């Protein structure tokens, strides 16, 4: 299985900036039906060509956002144990490791899933926020410095990124000086 020529032609990274509360979100693509198919091909089918498109899009955004590389760390959104077993990998963590190796930007795999959540598809924005609240926590013994850049495949409502930012700052102080996010795709408008 591979990515069709038509989908590859439509996959042209741009630069979109969105705000979720105080969280700056930088994205490469609008979340279109084609983008959805590419994300699913990577996430659920492990298609290397789709992985490469997502990696390239995220690197494009990291370059466009003009973020100072020496001052931030990439923080991947974690997958549940169930998703890891089903996919045979830690999807976003694996993509982020490749991005880190390609760019030389540091990575901190410091978030973990701390409780089971319901499937997000079909939930409203408010339901997604409620569903995700308390779903992530910091791994013990993690030392955090500088600025954090959360990495995810897509932002639709912002519930996952909100929760990840909450978990990063859950120690009663800002663990990182600032938290932003970079995603391959963004839903416009956020749902």
Predicted features, each with a name:
Residues 1-191:
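Glycine-rich phosphate/pyrophosphate-handling loop used in enzymes and phosphotransfer proteins
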């Amino acid at each position: 299985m591979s990515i069709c020529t038509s989908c590859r032609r439509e996959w042209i990274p741009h630069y979109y900036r969105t705000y979720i509360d105080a969280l700056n979100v930088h994205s490469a693509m609008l979340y279109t039906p084609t983008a959805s198919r590419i994300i699913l091909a990577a996430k659920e089918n492990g298609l290397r060509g789709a992985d490469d498109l997502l990696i390239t899009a995220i690197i494009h955004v990291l370059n466009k956002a003009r973020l100072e590389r020496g001052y931030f760390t990439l923080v991947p959104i974690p997958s549940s144990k169930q998703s890891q077993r089903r996919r045979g990998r830690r999807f976003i963590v694996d993509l982020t490791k490749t991005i880190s190796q390609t760019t030389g930007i540091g990575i901190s795999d410091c978030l973990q899933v701390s409780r089971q959540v319901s499937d997000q598809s079909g939930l409203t924005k408010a339901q997604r926020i409620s569903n995700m609240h308390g779903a992530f926590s910091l791994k013990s013994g993690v030392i955090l410095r500088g600025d954090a850049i959360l990495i995810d495949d897509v932002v639709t409502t912002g519930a996952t990124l909100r929760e990840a930012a909450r978990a990063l700052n859950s120690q009663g102080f800002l663990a990182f000086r600032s938290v932003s996010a970079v995603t391959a795709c963004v839903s416009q408008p956020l749902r």
